[in-house]
Amino acid sequence: VASSRGYIKTLLGRKRRFNMWEPRDSWGERAYSLSEAHSHYPKQELKRAYTHTAMNALIQGSSADITKSAMIKIYEAGLLDEIDLKLTVHDELDFSIPWNKQKCFEESLQIMKTCVDLKVPLTVDVEKGDSWGTIK
C-alpha cells in the first residue's frame, strides 16, 4: 500500500507519507524527492524509498494514536485534577496517584481500555507501589 499510494494511515487516520524515491534495482542509494531523483538517476526506474518501514509506522503510529486519545479523554473527564500524569514512555502512561484517589485510578483505567473503539479488547497492564523505586 505504501509503495502504490505513497502513504499509510494509522488507526485514527494520521498519514505517514513516503515521498522519497530511489533506484528500483539498486540497494543503498540515496533517496531524493521525485524531481531530484529523476535528476540524480536519469536512466533508472525509480521506486518509493523506505516503504519497508510502513508496517512498523502503522503499528507504532496507531499505538501513539491510542495513547494520545486516552490522555485527552482522561483530561476531559477532569481526572488530571485528582491524579498526576508524570510522564509518557512510548505507549505507557505513568501516574502518581494518592491511595485515597483509587476511584479516579479505576476510572482512568477504564478510559484507557475503551478510548478507541476496536473489535478486540485493549488490555492495560498496571504496576503499583508506594514509590517509583518500589515498582518492579
Go through each PLM region and give its residues.
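Conserved catalytic core of nucleotide polymerization and phosphodiester-bond processing enzymes
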Residues: 1-136
